C-alpha cells in the first residue's frame, strides 16, 4: 500500500485519511503536508487511520504535535479507526486522556 494522505471536509470537520505506514522515514513529509492543510482550514480535525498499516513512535509524535498546534488555536483533534495494536500504543502513550477516539459510526 502506498504511503499517502488525503483529506475532505465533512460536516464542518476536516477529516484526514492516512494510508500505509507512518514512521520515522516519512513523518517529516506528513508533518509538512499537514501544516499546509491545517493552515488552510479553521475546522476541528479527525485523523482517520483505517488504512494505516503501521505507526511508530514518530507517528505518535506527529499526532501529539498536531494536537498541541490545534489546541493553541482553540481547535479539537480526534483520532479514529486505529488498528488494535495502534490503539494500544495510543492508549499507553496517554493520548486518549487529551483527545477523543471516535468509532467508525461517529465519522
Q: Language-model features: where?
A:
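STAS-like cytosolic regulatory interaction modules
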Residues: 1-53, 67-107
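ABC-family nucleotide-binding domains
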Residues: 56
